[in-house]
C-alpha cells in the first residue's frame, strides 16, 4: 500500500513539474513534444500487437500439432442441404425479432402455470432448430406450420393486452411476409416510403465459428427483396389496411401450400379442382393442385367432355344399366318361406311377427323377452308385473303396445271365425293343387249322419286328440318341406287322425280348424 501511494505521489509531482516547464515553452515546442509522445504511444501499441500475434500463431501451431481436429463441427457444414441453410437463415431472422428471448426455449410449468393443460402441442425456436439440424423438415411449408403453431400457442394462452400476445402477433405477420412466395422468388414490389435497412454481412470469423451462413445462390435470392426479410418493427406491428391484407394473403398462401403438400403426399397423381361458371354461361374446370411453375390449368366442360359423341341418327344418349348396384329380393320375416322355417312363432301370422320385431328389434330381443316371461310363468302377479315393467323400460314402452296390438288382432280373428261357417265342400276345388281330397266325401257323410243323430261329444276322446293334433302341427312347421311338391305329404298318422271314426265333432261350437292338421295348398306351392 505504501509503495503504490508513493508512486502516485511521484507521478503527480512529475506532471506538475512538466506543466510548470510547459508554461515557459513556445507553441511550436509544445506541438513538437505532443507529436513525439503520440509517435511513442503508437510504437508501443504496435509492439504489443506484434507480440500478441506471434503468441497467437505459436499457440495455434501447438494446438494444431498436439490436439486433433474436431471434425464434428465441419461435418454438418459439408452435408447441409440448401433447404437446411435456408431454414437456418429464416430462423436467425425470426430470432432477431425476439430480442427478449420469449420464444427461445420451451415453456415450463414454473414459468407459465397450467400451460400444458391449455396447449397440447408446444413449440419454440430451440425445438425448430433441432428439427432443422436433424433434417426433419421436408419443405418450407412444414417450417411455416411449426412457426405458426408457436405463435398461435402464445396468442391462445396469453391475453390480448399482454406483451407476449402482441409480440406473437407481430412476429407471425413478419415471419409470414418474410417466408411468402413473393419474397422467396424476389417478385414482391417494395414501396419507396419504407426505408431499406442496411444488411449486416457476417464476418469470416463468424462463418467459420458458427457455420450458419447460407449459400451464395440462396443469399442472392434473398438480397433481391431485402425489405421483406429485414422488415422494420414499427411497420410490422401496425395493422393498417395494407398490412392486414398482406397478413391475410400470407395466411391464405400458407394454407394453400399445406393443402397442396397433403394432396401430393396422399394422392400423388390426382388432379383436384373446382367448377366456375362465366357470365356467358360457359363452365370451366380449374385444377388446384397443378404444377406451380406452369400457368393455371383450366378445361372447358361440355357434353363432349362428359360423354362420347352422339350418333347422327339418334337424338338421345344410350341408356346402360349399372349392374354394380343391382337390388336383389330379400327374404324378410313376412315371406311364407321364412314363416315355414321359423320354429319360434309357428302360431303367429306375418303381421304379428312384424309387430314382435318392431317392439323387440331382433331375434335376440324376442328370445330374451320370452325367456323372462317363461321364467315367471308359474309365479304370482307381482313377479309378472315386474317383468312387464322391466321390458317396458328396456323397449321404451313398446312391450305393452305390442302385447295389446297382438291381443286385439287375435280377438278380432276369433270373432270372425266364430261367426263364419266352414264349408268343406269348397275345398274340393283344390284337388288339382296336390291335396288329398279323398277324406272330404267321408266328412260329408259324417256330417249328414250327425245331423240325424242326437249324440254327444266324448270329452275324454277330444282331450286325447288335442295333444296329437298339436304334435302334428309342430312337426309340420319345423320339418323341412319335401322336394316333390306335386305329391301329397300326408302320412299314415295324418290319415288316422283325420279319419271319420276319430272325428266326432257333432254340433259343438268349439270345433277345431281343419287347417291345423291339413296341409295348406299355399305353403305347399311355395315349398
Swiss-Prot record:
The keyword Nucleus applies. One of its GO terms (cellular component) is nucleus. Residues 1-54, 468-527 are annotated as: Disordered. It comes from the Eukaryota. It is found in: Nucleus. CDD domains: Bromo_brd7_like (cd05513). Residues 1-16, 31-41 have a biased composition (Basic residues). InterPro entries: Bromodomain, Bromodomain-like_sf, Bromodomain_contain_prot, Bromodomain_CS, DUF3512. Pfam families: Bromodomain, DUF3512. Residues 479-490 have a biased composition (Low complexity). One of its GO terms (molecular function) is lysine-acetylated histone binding. Keywords: Bromodomain, Chromatin regulator, Nucleus, Transcription, Transcription regulation. Residues 78-182 form the Bromo domain. GO terms for biological process: chromatin organization; regulation of transcription by RNA polymerase II. Binds acetylated histones H3 and H4. Binds butyrylated histone H4. Plays a role in chromatin remodeling and regulation of transcription. Acts as a chromatin reader that recognizes and binds acylated histones: binds histones that are acetylated and/or butyrylated. The Bromo domain mediates interaction with histones that have acetylated lysine residues at specific positions. Also recognizes and binds histones that are butyrylated. This is Bromodomain-containing protein 9.
Amino acid at each position: 500500500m505504501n509503495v503504490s501511494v508513493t508512486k502516485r505521489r511521484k507521478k503527480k509531482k512529475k506532471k506538475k513539474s512538466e506543466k510548470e516547464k510547459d508554461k515557459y515553452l513556445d507553441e511550436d515546442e509544445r506541438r513538437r513534444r505532443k507529436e513525439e509522445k503520440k509517435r511513442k504511444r503508437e510504437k508501443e501499441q504496435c509492439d504489443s500487437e506484434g507480440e500478441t500475434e506471434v503468441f497467437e500463431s505459436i499457440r495455434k501451431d501447438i494446438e494444431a500439432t498436439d490436439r486433433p481436429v474436431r471434425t464434428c463441427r465441419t461435418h454438418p457444414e459439408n452435408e447441409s442441404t440448401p433447404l437446411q441453410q435456408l431454414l437456418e437463415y429464416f430462423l436467425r431472422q425470426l430470432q432477431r425479432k425476439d430480442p427478449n428471448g420469449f420464444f427461445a426455449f420451451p415453456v415450463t410449468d414454473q414459468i407459465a402455470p397450467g400451460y400444458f393443460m391449455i396447449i397440447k402441442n408446444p413449440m419454440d425456436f430451440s425445438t425448430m432448430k433441432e428439427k432443422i439440424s436433424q433434417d426433419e423438415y421436408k419443405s418450407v411449408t412444414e417450417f411455416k406450420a411449426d412457426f405458426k403453431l408457436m405463435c398461435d400457442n402464445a396468442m391462445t394462452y396469453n391475453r390480448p393486452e399482454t406483451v407476449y400476445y402482441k409480440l406473437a402477433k407481430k412476429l407471425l405477420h413478419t415471419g409470414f411476409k418474410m417466408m411468402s412466395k413473393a419474397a422467396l422468388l424476389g417478385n414482391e414490389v417494395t414501396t419507396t416510403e419504407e426505408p431499406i435497412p442496411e444488411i449486416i454481412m457476417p464476418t469470416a470469423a463468424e462463418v467459420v465459428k458458427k457455420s450458419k451462413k447460407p449459400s451464395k445462390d440462396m443469399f442472392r435470392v434473398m438480397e433481391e427483396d431485402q425489405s421483406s426479410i429485414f422488415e422494420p418493427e414499427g411497420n410490422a406491428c401496425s395493422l393498417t389496411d395494407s398490412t392486414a391484407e398482406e397478413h391475410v394473403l400470407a395466411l391464405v398462401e400458407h394454407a394453400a401450400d399445406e393443402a397442396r403438400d397433403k394432396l401430393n403426399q396422399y394422392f400423388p397423381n390426382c388432379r383436384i379442382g373446382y367448377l366456375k361458371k362465366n357470365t356467358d354461361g360457359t363452365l370451366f374446370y380449374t385444377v388446384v393442385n397443378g404444377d406451380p411453375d406452369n400457368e393455371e390449368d383450366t378445361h372447358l366442360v361440355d357434353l363432349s367432355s362428359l360423354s362420347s359423341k352422339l350418333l347422327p341418327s339418334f337424338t338421345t344418349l344410350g341408356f346402360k344399366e349399372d349392374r354394380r348396384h343391382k337390388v336383389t329380393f330379400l327374404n324378410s320375416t313376412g315371406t311364407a318361406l321364412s314363416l315355414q322355417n321359423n320354429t319360434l312363432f309357428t302360431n303367429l301370422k306375418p303381421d304379428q311377427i312384424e309387430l314382435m320385431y318392431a317392439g323387440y328389434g331382433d331375434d335376440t330381443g324376442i328370445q330374451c323377452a320370452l325367456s323372462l316371461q317363461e321364467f315367471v310363468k308359474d309365479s304370482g302377479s307381482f313377479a309378472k308385473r315386474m317383468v312387464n315393467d322391466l321390458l317396458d323400460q328396456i323397449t321404451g314402452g313398446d312391450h305393452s303396445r305390442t302385447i295389446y296390438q297382438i291381443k286385439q288382432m287375435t280377438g278380432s280373428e276369433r270373432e270372425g271365425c266364430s261367426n263364419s261357417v266352414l264349408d268343406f265342400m269348397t275345398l274340393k276345388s283344390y284337388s288339382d293343387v296336390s291335396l288329398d281330397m279323398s277324406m272330404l266325401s267321408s266328412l260329408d257323410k259324417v256330417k249328414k249322419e250327425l245331423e240325424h243323430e242326437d249324440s254327444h261329444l266324448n270329452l275324454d276322446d277330444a282331450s286325447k286328440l288335442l295333444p296329437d293334433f298339436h304334435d302334428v302341427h309342430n312337426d309340420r312347421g319345423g320339418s323341412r318341406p319335401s322336394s316333390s311338391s306335386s305329391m301329397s305329404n300326408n302320412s299314415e298318422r295324418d290319415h288316422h287322425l283325420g279319419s271319420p271314426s276319430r272325428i266326432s265333432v257333432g254340433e259343438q261350437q268349439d270345433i277345431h280348424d281343419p287347417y291345423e292338421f291339413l296341409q295348406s295348398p299355399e305353403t305347399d306351392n311355395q315349398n
